[in-house]
Swiss-Prot record:
This is Small ribosomal subunit protein uS4c. NCBIfam families: PRK05327.1, rpsD_bact. Belongs to the universal ribosomal protein uS4 family. One of its GO terms (biological process) is ribosomal small subunit biogenesis. It is found in: Plastid, Chloroplast. The keyword Ribosomal protein applies. Keywords: Chloroplast, Plastid, Ribonucleoprotein, Ribosomal protein, RNA-binding, rRNA-binding. GO terms for molecular function: rRNA binding; structural constituent of ribosome. One of its GO terms (cellular component) is chloroplast. InterPro entries: Ribosomal_uS4, Ribosomal_uS4_bac-type, Ribosomal_uS4_CS, Ribosomal_uS4_N, S4_RNA-bd, S4_RNA-bd_sf. Its main location: plastid. Residues 92-156 form the S4 RNA-binding domain.
Length: 207
């Protein structure tokens, strides 16, 4: 299954707010159901609940079905909680790191910067959005002038307290902001509200 490129509002109306996909907030279709209609609704199955959790994770981080399945398989082979390791793997992707630093408004925007070869990790150009960042990595945003003003305005409007503790943003060189990965992200700093165990359960027979 390819990466979704359709209307984003349609997705967040169905799956609720996804900060990585869009910064727009809308009321989900479930919340719009009137009291009279609620009585006629069928009970949601456990499969549907797990499917929705999986879809929320996939669309928020902009993954294909195959990519997410591969991440689940990697998490299963690692020591520790499969769900938490899965979230760590997704949060430590380069495109998500740029998003969490406040350099770009969404993960798709971060992916565009990376694909255009404007991002350096440890002084080397990286053009792979899924690149896995590690503690002590230094990420430099070397965007051209056309991007610099946009990035500067974005950073100025982004509250510093929104940057999670495992990351640090340095503006000592305004034209080349730098991000520092301090350590692996912990569960409390995950940007998406989700029950990761539902995703693990969804893939229990597939991974």
């Amino acid at each position: 299954m390819s990466r979704y490129r359709g209307p984003r509002l349609r997705i967040i109306r169905r799956l609720r707010n996804l900060p990585g996909l869009t910064n727009k907030l809308v009321e989900s279709k479930k919340n719009q159901v009137s009291g009279s209609d609620q009585s006629n609704q069928k009970k949601v199955s456990q499969y549907c609940i797990r499917l929705e959790a999986k879809q929320r994770l996939r669309f928020n981080y902009g993954l294909t079905e195959r990519q997410l399945l591969n991440y689940v398989r990697i998490a299963r082979c690692a020591k520790g909680s499969t769900g938490q390791i899965l979230l760590q793997l997704l949060e430590m992707r380069l495109d998500n790191i740029l998003f969490r630093l406040g350099v770009v408004p969404t993960i798709p925007s971060a992916r565009q910067l990376i694909n255009h070869r404007h991002i350096l990790v440890n002084n080397r150009i990286v053009d792979i959005p899924s690149f896995h960042c590690k503690p002590k990595d230094i990420i430099t945003i070397g965007a051209p002038k056309t991007y610099q003003s946009i990035i500067t305005k974005r950073i100025e409007s982004f509250a510093k307290d929104q940057i999670p503790d495992h990351l640090t943003l340095s503006l000592s060189e305004p034209k080349k902001p730098k991000g520092f990965v301090n350590y692996l992200i912990n569960r409390e700093s995950i940007g998406l509200k989700i029950n990761e165990l539902l995703v693990v359960e969804y893939y229990s027979r597939k991974a």
